Amino acid sequence: MAKLTVKDVDLKGKKVLVRVDFNVPLKDGVITNDNRITAALPTIKYIIEQGGRAILFSHLGRVKEEADKEGKSLAPVAADLAAKLGQDVVFPGVTRGAELEAAINALEDGQVLLVENTRFEDVDGKKESKNDPELGKYWASLGDGIFVNDAFGTAHRAHASNVGISGNVEKAVAGFLLENEIAYIQEAVETPERPFVAILGGSKVSDKIGVIENLLEKADKVLIGGGMTYTFYKAQGIEIGNSLVEEDKLDVAKALLEKANGKLVLPVDSKEANAFADYTEVKDTEGEAVDPGFLGLDIGPKSIAKFDEALTGAKTVVWNGPMGVFENPDFQAGTIGVMDAIVKQPGVKSIIGGGDSAAAAINLGRADKFSWISTGGGASMELLEGKVLPGLAALTEK
C-alpha cells in the first residue's frame, strides 16, 4: 500500500486521533455483535503501547433529528471497549466543546478516550455526513497532527471524521484493519493467484452491475446466485414464476451475459416455495424454470454441484452475497454448499466481502475457515468495482 501506516509515525506522548468503525448493532442498549470493536483492537493497543493517547471517533446508526439520538449513544461501546482493553475508557459523552477539550487535555500516555457518536453532528445540517469543513478542522485541532483511519466500513464515504480530519493534519495514516482490508481485497482483484473465481449473490442486479462488469474483466469465472438469478433467467426467456425480478434491468442482464463470453456461471435449478413467508410447499425445480405460482428462494442441489465443480482448483475466491434466503433453514443449503466448496480448496485465498455474506458465514459457523472476512459491506463492494475510496485517497502518501 502506497500510504503511510500507523507504524510509520512516532506516537509517544502524542494525542492521536483515530477513526474506528464502532457501528455495532444494539438491542435495548446491549451490543448484539461486537466484531467491529474486536477488529479495531490491534490498532488501539498498538497506539497505547507506543505511549500515544488514543482519541477515538465513530458513528453509530443514522441520526437526522434530535429524536434519533435515542439509543444511539456510544456509552455501551465505551464500556465494552474498556472491558476488552482491561483499562478505563474516558467517555465525555459529547462531540465538541469545553468538556471534551478538557478531557482530552487531561489524558496521559497510554490512555483512551471515545468521542460521542459523530453523527450527532448531523442533527444540525448534516455536518458529519456532508464533511463540513469547520467540523473537520475542529476535530483535527484536538490532536497533535496525527490521524489514524482504521474504519474501512466508512472508507467509501467522505465524512468530516475521516476525510475532513485527514485534510487538516500533518500525517493521516492507515490503521492495521484498513491496511489488511485493502491488501486482501485489492490484491485479490488486481493481482490474484489464478484460477480466480468470484461469487456474487444477493437479491438485486442493480446493486452489483459495476462489480459484475469489473470482475468479468479480472476473474476467470463469475458465479451468480441469490435473487438476481431470476433477472438473468428472464432476460433469456426462462420462466421464473413469481420470483423476484428487476424488469428495468433485463437489458443490462442480457448485455452482461453477452459480454461475459461464457465467464458468467448461472444456477441450473432452484429451491422453490409457493410463498415467501407462509408457504405450504417447498421443492426443487426440475431445471432452470420456476413453476407457476412458485418463487425461487435458493439455488438447488444441481447448482450446488455445478458451483462446487466451478470452484475446484481455485486459488483465489471472492464471495459477496448469499445464494438464497439463508436466514431461513429451508433456504440455506445453497449458501452452506458454496461456503463448503470454497473452504475445501487446498491453499485457497478466500475472501468474504462483508454484509450478508459475512453474517451468513458467522451464523452458519464457517467464519474461521475463510482467509479474510471484510468489515465493510459498501466499502468492499466499491473496491470490487474498482473504485477509489475517498477515506483511503485522503491518507498521506509514503
Curated annotation (Swiss-Prot):
Keywords: ATP-binding, Cytoplasm, Glycolysis, Kinase, Nucleotide-binding, Transferase. Substrate binds at D21, F22, N23, R36, H59, L60, G61, R62, R119, R157. Pathway: Carbohydrate degradation; glycolysis; pyruvate from D-glyceraldehyde 3-phosphate: step 2/5. Its main location: cytoplasm. It is found in: Cytoplasm. It catalyses: (2R)-3-phosphoglycerate + ATP = (2R)-3-phospho-glyceroyl phosphate + ADP. Its EC number is 2.7.2.3. Transmembrane segments: none annotated. GO terms for cellular component: cytosol. InterPro entries: Phosphoglycerate_kinase, Phosphoglycerate_kinase_CS, Phosphoglycerate_kinase_N, Phosphoglycerate_kinase_sf. Pfam families: PGK. GO terms for molecular function: ADP binding; ATP binding; phosphoglycerate kinase activity. ATP binds at K208, G296, E327, G354, G355, D356, S357. Monomer. Belongs to the phosphoglycerate kinase family. This is Phosphoglycerate kinase. The lineage of its organism: Bacteria, Bacillati, Bacillota, Bacilli, Lactobacillales.
